[in-house]
UniProtKB/Swiss-Prot annotation:
The lineage of its organism: Bacteria, Bacillati, Bacillota, Bacilli, Lactobacillales. NCBIfam families: PRK13676.1-1 (NF010209). Pfam families: Com_YlbF. It comes from Streptococcus pneumoniae (strain ATCC 700669 / Spain 23F-1). This is UPF0342 protein SPN23F13380. Belongs to the UPF0342 family.
Amino acid sequence: MSNIYDSANELSRGLRGLPEYKAVKAAKDAIAADAEASKIFTEYLAFQEEIQKLAHTGQMPDASFQAKMEGFGKQIQGNSLLSEFFTKQQQLAIYLSDIEKIVFEPVSELLK
């Protein structure tokens, strides 16, 4: 019987081999090579982190956060590199969601 960690590492290698993973990586590399896209992307990630910190402390984002989010949405839609990255990321997320269901199925069975 194989070690469960070996299986997890094999899954990790399998994910890296997916065309969708490679497409996300290529899109991220393209962002890194473009100064404007890279700046927006970095600012967006910092903003997302700020929202997550608020959520962890039980605070709700105020109206300024909503306005800032809308601004980022417009910037992302207006930049083909960023738009492509997030589209490719959504395609990869389908695999991750399916894998999550498979991995956590035994745990959910224990709770029934």
